[in-house]
Amino acid sequence: MEISIPTTLGLAVIIFIIFKLLTRTTSKKNLLPEPWRLPIIGHMHHLIGTMPHRGVMELARKHGSLMHLQLGEVSTIVVSSPRWAKEVLTTYDITFANRPETLTGEIVAYHNTDIVLAPYGEYWRQLRKLCTLELLSNKKVKSFQSLREEECWNLVKDIRSTGQGSPINLSENIFKMIATILSRAAFGKGIKDQMKFTELVKEILRLTGGFDVADIFPSKKLLHHLSGKRAKLTNIHNKLDNLINNIIAEHPGNRTSSSQETLLDVLLRLKESAEFPLTADNVKAVILDMFGAGTDTSSATIEWAISELIRCPRAMEKVQTELRQALNGKERIQEEDLQELNYLKLVIKETLRLHPPLPLVMPRECREPCVLGGYDIPSKTKLIVNVFAINRDPEYWKDAETFMPERFENSPITVMGSEYEYLPFGAGRRMCPGAALGLANVELPLAHILYYFNWKLPNGKTFEDLDMTESFGATVQRKTELLLVPTDFQTLTAST
């Protein structure tokens, strides 16, 4: 019996529909909840016009704290609650210990050989050990105390030099100070082209935020070129590479003691001794890590702390009173003076709760298929932990959107990721290794800014007028620079 073409097509359509229904029923049994999606771009349209961390938080409130997003070609799971954060960062920590490959990592981080982006494995484990024992140990962080104190003092003098009643760009001054601290820690004092180096790093940080087309469509190499990002990153990287090569070539070796060693000294010593298989590019990748990540995160945290204090005069008065009573007119602040300043530490904790420097932490990647909460998670799935949402979860935080340092009084919660409702530096194996250095670079500068000066908004504005709009880059910064008028409080008698 001959079958007509229309009949054949009809049968084909029926078979196709039945097949799709059957496979949909089968495949979706173990898939995570998700918003509605579009072809090709997946769920990206839900995030247009939003800050990524806020957009993802709003989606999670509708679809659950364990949710799937298809970001272009990249299958992504988003965790937005302490419960699921603890699960993926403890029980499944090794499973999600990898990093997804990115265009920035390929070009800027010397093919992902830095600490942050290196794939999980022996090389990364050795780097982590190097950080723990050498580069970012408590002893090494302590060894940079004198330069922190010196650069904080220089900041005070710079602010004083502007004269009374004149607004200053505090954002610019803070970034410059942190960059100088880290530059001296990394390379020593008086390197050539420090400002050029800092500006290039700043440009990379600006280019690496959000969901980039090159990273959500990794297989579409043509898009990487059409977007212009590959060319921009390559250009900046080449300039940075030349600068670092010159710094290394001119760097004096043979420090007389380990306490005098810069971060570059440590890396070159280990490279030359063959204690660790470091290449010249590995050394440069790690140095860029320390400088880039540290500058942006510390300066942003200080800015947000001051912004929140300006908007909360009660807390500003309380922290300044604590500082001024404890120091009792002391001319120069030392880090030892801050050990018992409890409210200052609460202010920093609360700032990190509301404004974690990396609100989506650093994405991880699933190393092997697993089952999470009864859902099938394929290998290579990207993991985002939205610490911004977790830190503002109303189930765990009363008045979660309010700046209230007192919430941490008599609280066992620390910044080191042991309590999963508060994760400013992440948690688990891939937690930020520079937390101790970052905190040291926040606490002392903030103390100087608050101890020596009173602050107000320019042009008669009140605290309600302060713009708190965010800008998403490598970290979440203020969109507008922080312009404030200093009023001298603590009179200085020394000129040095």
From Swiss-Prot:
Stored Pfam families: p450
Biological role: Valencene oxidase, which preferentially hydroylates the C2 position of (+)-valencene in the trans-orientation, producing trans-nootkatol that can be further oxidized to (+)-nootkatone. Can also catalyze the three-step conversion of germacrene A to germacra-1(10),4,11(13)-trien-12-oic acid and the partial conversion of the non-natural substrate amorpha-4,11-diene into artemisinic alcohol and artemisinic aldehyde.
Residues annotated for heme binding in this entry: 432
GO annotation, cellular component aspect: membrane
Species this protein is from: Cichorium intybus
An example Gene Ontology molecular-function term: iron ion binding
Top-level taxon in the UniProt lineage: Eukaryota
Needed cofactors: heme
Gene: CYP71AV8
GO annotation, biological process: sesquiterpene biosynthetic process
Family per similarity comment: Belongs to the cytochrome P450 family.
Protein's UniProt keywords contain Heme: yes
Membrane-traversing stretches: 3-23
Keyword terms of this UniProt record: Heme, Iron, Membrane, Metal-binding, Monooxygenase, Oxidoreductase, Transmembrane, Transmembrane helix
Protein's UniProt keywords contain Membrane: yes
Protein name from the UniProt record: Cytochrome P450 71AV8
EC number of this enzyme: 1.14.13.-
Membrane topology of the entry: Single-pass membrane protein
Record localization: Membrane
UniProt cross-references to InterPro entries, sorted A to Z: Cyt_P450, Cyt_P450_CS, Cyt_P450_E_grp-I, Cyt_P450_sf
Matching Gene3D superfamilies: Cytochrome P450
